[in-house]
């Protein structure tokens, strides 16, 4: 069996139990065997991975190593990778090969990590089930008839199925945390601006944030150590200094106060999911943490506000895909208008078109004040709610999703039902706060996820809370059988 965690791989490489090439070959063989069913990867970079693994082994033998040297990872296909196709799960970019490397993937290359490939995703990161991909849906490895979550479903399913040690994702309204919950993983959405967006194809620029998928909070801390930091090439990148996110993992929880937002424990929450959360609360209490009920009164407005702001930003960001400069171009256009119309009609899927139309409507002259400006005012109220609550407590504990993974096709005919899947993840995104998703139980053989939300730039505290919980539970150690 492959080692499950980055920490185990680091130890194995250091102790010469295996080489980076050997472990990379094992992962590539597993991808060949399981990816045809799960559809986690859009592109597998076998030659690149083996070359990087050999270089990592050479560095290791020369004593020139770094923390992630030789560790095989996968990247969501929204990060530009020089010389490697970056599709964003869309026909529009099916053949797009970026001429440069994103900051995130560049940092992992510089850290010595091995790139196994690019993972499947909802088209342009728009979706909550990974059913919107031009390259077909991803299947949840816990039950292949169910969704892995979205939009980073390929990354989540790949890590859960053991096709890679960890993976990158992006989170606009829950696209790391929701798949982490559905697939039984640890997933971190950092504070907005903590991770560079350079080379991360934009969906909603004021919300998009890159982050890691891993099996443990400790692994997520190791990954964030590489990903985080100011990037002068990204105008939204935070100037706040980074830290060693592993340094506080062992800190005891005595004296920590955790808030329970009463609006999240509502009748929308499945009873068995709530029971799992109550058991998690007991674990934290046994570790010395105390709990306090808090209120986030504008929570119910988060989904409608988000589905004005995010589509508005997407409608402007995706205007660049016009068939002229790059991306899909229709055949034999009769004039410029025909080129624009047919290239975009052919290149974009239904959900992307829906959101472009919603966003264009919200930004139109007659409706800008009624919709977009109002949504931004609500966003400020939601942020103020969090600021007030987090002045009283060290972090918030709440569900990630209302229920466990739903069946493929179950919600595709009703966009509103699909949008409501993000009801517990969107608020932290609108506020720009860091949030950590963790597995905390099972319901009917499917993972249940919980979410820890912290104040700005308190990722180390969230990872400490996650690590201490995982030292005292084993939910994160469970893996889907996959016929093994």
Swiss-Prot record:
Catalysed transformations (reactions): L-glutamyl-tRNA(Gln) + L-glutamine + ATP + H2O = L-glutaminyl-tRNA(Gln) + L-glutamate + ADP + phosphate + H(+)
A single cellular component GO annotation: glutamyl-tRNA(Gln) amidotransferase complex
Top-level taxon: Bacteria
Keyword annotations from UniProtKB, A to Z: ATP-binding, Ligase, Nucleotide-binding, Protein biosynthesis
EC number assigned by the record: 6.3.5.7
UniProt-listed GO biological process terms: translation
One example GO MF annotation: ATP binding
Enzyme class, UniProt record, top EC level: ligase
Active-site residues from the entry: 76 (charge relay system), 151 (charge relay system), 175 (acyl-ester intermediate)
Entry function: Allows the formation of correctly charged Gln-tRNA(Gln) through the transamidation of misacylated Glu-tRNA(Gln) in organisms which lack glutaminyl-tRNA synthetase. The reaction takes place in the presence of glutamine and ATP through an activated gamma-phospho-Glu-tRNA(Gln).
Assembly with partners or alone: Heterotrimer of A, B and C subunits.
Family: Belongs to the amidase family. GatA subfamily.
Protein name: Glutamyl-tRNA(Gln) amidotransferase subunit A
Taxonomic source organism: Hahella chejuensis (strain KCTC 2396)
């Amino acid at each position: 069996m492959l080692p499950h965690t980055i920490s185990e791989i680091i130890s194995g490489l250091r102790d010469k139990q295996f080489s980076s090439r050997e472990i990379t070959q094992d992962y590539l063989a597993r991808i060949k065997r399981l990816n045809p069913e799960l559809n986690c990867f859009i592109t597998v970079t076998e030659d690149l991975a083996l070359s990087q693994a050999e270089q990592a082994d050479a560095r290791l033998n020369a004593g020139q190593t770094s923390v992630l040297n030789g560790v095989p990872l996968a990247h969501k296909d929204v990060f530009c990778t020089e010389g490697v196709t970056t599709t964003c799960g869309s026909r529009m970019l099916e053949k797009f090969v970026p001429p440069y490397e994103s900051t995130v993937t560049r940092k992992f290359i510089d850290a010595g990590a091995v790139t196994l490939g690019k993972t499947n995703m909802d088209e342009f990161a728009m979706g909550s089930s990974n059913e919107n991909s031009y390259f077909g849906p991803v299947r949840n490895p816990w039950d292949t008839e169910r969704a892995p979550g979205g939009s980073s479903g390929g990354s989540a399913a790949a890590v859960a199925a053991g096709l890679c040690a960890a993976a990158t994702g992006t989170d606009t309204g829950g696209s790391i945390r929701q798949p982490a919950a559905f697939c039984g993983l640890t997933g971190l959405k950092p504070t907005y601006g903590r991770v560079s967006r350079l080379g991360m194809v934009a969906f909603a620029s004021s919300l998009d944030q890159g982050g890691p998928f891993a099996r443990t909070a400790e692994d997520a801390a190791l990954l964030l150590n590489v990903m985080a930091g100011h990037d002068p090439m990204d105008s939204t990148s935070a100037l706040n200094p980074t830290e060693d996110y592993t340094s506080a993992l062992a800190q005891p929880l005595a004296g920590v106060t955790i808030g329970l937002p009463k609006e999240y424990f509502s009748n929308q929450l499945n009873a068995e999911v709530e029971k799992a959360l109550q058991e998690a609360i007991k674990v934290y209490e046994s570790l010395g943490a105390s709990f306090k009920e808090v209120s986030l009164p504008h929570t119910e407005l988060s989904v409608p506000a988000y589905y004005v702001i995010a589509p508005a930003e997407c409608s402007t960001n995706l205007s660049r895909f016009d068939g002229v400069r790059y991306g899909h171009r229709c055949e034999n256009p009769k004039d410029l208008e025909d080129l624009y119309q047919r290239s975009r009609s052919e290149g974009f899927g239904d959900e992307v078109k829906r959101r472009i139309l919603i966003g264009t409507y919200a930004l139109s002259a007659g409706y800008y004040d009624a919709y977009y400006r109002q949504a931004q005012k609500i966003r400020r109220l939601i942020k103020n709610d969090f600021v007030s609550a987090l002045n009283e407590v060290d972090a918030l504990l709440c569900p990630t999703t209302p229920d466990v993974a739903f069946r493929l096709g179950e919600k595709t005919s009703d966009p509103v039902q699909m949008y409501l899947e993000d009801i517990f993840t969107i608020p932290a995104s609108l506020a720009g706060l860091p949030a950590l998703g963790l597995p905390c139980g099972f319901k009917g053989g499917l993972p249940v996820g919980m979410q820890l939300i912290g104040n700005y730039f308190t990722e180390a505290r969230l990872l400490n809370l996650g690590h201490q919980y995982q030292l005292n539970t084993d939910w994160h150690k469970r893996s889907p059988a996959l016929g093994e």
